[in-house]
Curated annotation (Swiss-Prot):
The modification Phosphotyrosine is found at residue 247. Disulfide bonds join 54-192, 187-198. It comes from Chlorocebus aethiops (Green monkey). There is a cross-link at residues 144, 237 (Glycyl lysine isopeptide (Lys-Gly) (interchain with G-Cter in SUMO)). The keyword Disulfide bond applies. Residues 317-382 are annotated as: Disordered. Residues 362-374 have a biased composition (Low complexity). Keywords: Acetylation, Cell junction, Cell membrane, Disulfide bond, Endoplasmic reticulum, Gap junction, Isopeptide bond, Membrane, Phosphoprotein, S-nitrosylation, Transmembrane, Transmembrane helix, Ubl conjugation. This is Gap junction alpha-1 protein. Residues 45-76, 177-207 are extracellular. GO terms for biological process: bone development; bone remodeling; cell communication by electrical coupling; cell-cell signaling; heart development; microtubule-based transport; negative regulation of cell growth; regulation of apoptotic process. Gap junction protein that acts as a regulator of bladder capacity. A gap junction consists of a cluster of closely packed pairs of transmembrane channels, the connexons, through which materials of low MW diffuse from one cell to a neighboring cell. May play a critical role in the physiology of hearing by participating in the recycling of potassium to the cochlear endolymph. Negative regulator of bladder functional capacity: acts by enhancing intercellular electrical and chemical transmission, thus sensitizing bladder muscles to cholinergic neural stimuli and causing them to contract. Phosphorylation at Ser-325, Ser-328 and Ser-330 by CK1 modulates gap junction assembly. Phosphorylated at Ser-368 by PRKCG; phosphorylation induces disassembly of gap junction plaques and inhibition of gap junction activity. Phosphorylation at Ser-368 by PRKCD triggers its internalization into small vesicles leading to proteasome-mediated degradation. Sumoylated with SUMO1, SUMO2 and SUMO3, which may regulate the level of functional Cx43 gap junctions at the plasma membrane. May be desumoylated by SENP1 or SENP2. It is a multi-pass membrane protein.
Length: 382
């Protein structure tokens, strides 16, 4: 048997990039397959053809009968099985090395951009693209490769192919040999002159090893299935929690109830901005709501609020008896909210409006009227 150290070193590197189930599968592969195959099994099948005897003196009869009974040796069959079930894992390891190589290139490019940034060059967009690529390849900040995206798909595909190869080799072994060996094999094949009986050496020992390798194959298949379900449900769980792609941006417009950072919004929808300036024409205590004119519901509400504000303003102007008011009647006309630049231009061209004091509209009592000697604007002159 050849040296397994090269394959063992390659598979050992996969340990750092596998799940718990993958690590157990690799342990089973190393201990119960490669190690056992290189020591006990090979010695048990070392004399399989030389100890295969038939009750005939015809030259070549034993060779053709052995070829009919064992088209391929059990040892070589298990070697092929180990190689085939290890190839998907090696392909996954190649993908990991590819991602690590991409990481080195991205880190080198990022360092060059940071050097250019210190010289005053605007490279924020390029740095952001590098971060997105790192997340796409599954590279974390500390340089560790995380299983997600294309790397996760490669891992799932490798598990599927390992399971397929395990099932295929079990079926082939059952079709060619069965899962037990007989002590006597009957052969009738040219150049044998007649039907001959051939005898196998150590059939019981070989049957025990066959059953043991069968159990190991079933255990490996079960580990692959468990790991497949584990990786699948873990991916679904991460996607539900929103951890799959933090750089993903929604294309739809934000709702006014969530976008509270804008300067124009409706505070009645659950947003409030303590930094938003009040309108210069509104008296203290009033809240003149503003909103996005493209939103029909906010626009209707703002028109009603503006009508009420203008009605309050005109009523106070009439009560104070100020002539030359900018409001000619007590019914304010609804208007749409212009931009801030238009408001400033209109205020500069017209009269500057003074803030109004809040007047108590409740009728005063007689006692308070007699007690107060101050003249009121609505008193009649005699």
């Amino acid at each position: 048997m050849g040296d397994w150290s090269a394959l063992g070193k390659l598979l050992d590197k996969v340990q750092a990039y596998s799940t718990a189930g993958g690590k157990v599968w690799l342990s089973v592969l190393f201990i119960f397959r490669i190690l056992l195959l290189g020591t006990a099994v090979e010695s048990a099948w070392g004399d399989e053809q030389s100890a295969f005897r038939c009750n005939t003196q015809q030259p070549g009869c034993e060779n053709v009968c052995y070829d009919k009974s064992f088209p391929i040796s059990h040892v070589r069959f298990w070697v092929l099985q180990i190689i085939f079930v290890s190839v998907p894992t090696l392909l996954y390891l190649a993908h990991v090395f590819y991602v690590m190589r991409k990481e080195e290139k991205l880190n080198k490019k990022e360092e060059e951009l940071k050097v250019a940034q210190t010289d005053g060059v605007n490279v924020e967009m390029h740095l952001k693209q590098i971060e997105i690529k790192k997340f796409k390849y599954g590279i974390e900040e500390h340089g560790k490769v995380k299983m997600r995206g294309g790397l996760l798909r490669t891992y799932i595909i490798s598990i599927l192919f390992k399971s397929i190869f395990e099932v295929a080799f079990l079926l082939i072994q059952w079709y060619i040999y069965g899962f037990s060996l007989s002590a006597v094999y009957t052969c009738k094949r040219d150049p044998c002159p007649h039907q001959v009986d051939c005898f196998l050496s150590r059939p019981t020992e070989k049957t025990i090893f066959i059953i043991f390798m069968l159990v190991v194959s079933l255990v490996s298949l079960a580990l692959n299935i468990i790991e497949l379900f584990y990786v699948f449900f873990k991916g679904v769980k991460d996607r539900v929690k929103g951890k799959s792609d933090p750089y993903h941006t929604t294309s739809g417009a934000l709702s006014p109830t969530k976008d509270c950072g804008s300067q124009k919004y409706a505070y009645f929808n659950g947003c409030s901005s303590p930094t938003a300036p009040l309108s210069p024409m509104s008296p203290p205590g009033y809240k003149l709501v503003t909103g996005d004119r493209n939103n029909s519901s906010c626009r209707n509400y703002n028109k009603q609020a503006s009508e009420q504000n203008w009605a309050n303003y005109s009523a106070e102007q009439n009560r104070m008896g100020q002539a030359g008011s900018t409001i000619s009647n007590s019914h304010a006309q609804p208007f749409d909210f212009p931009d801030d630049n238009q408001n400033s231009k209109k205020l500069a061209a017209g009269h500057e409006l003074q803030p109004l004091a809040i007047v108590d509209q409740r009728p005063s009592s007689r006692a308070s009227s007699r007690a107060s000697s101050r003249p009121r604007p609505d008193d009649l002159e005699i």
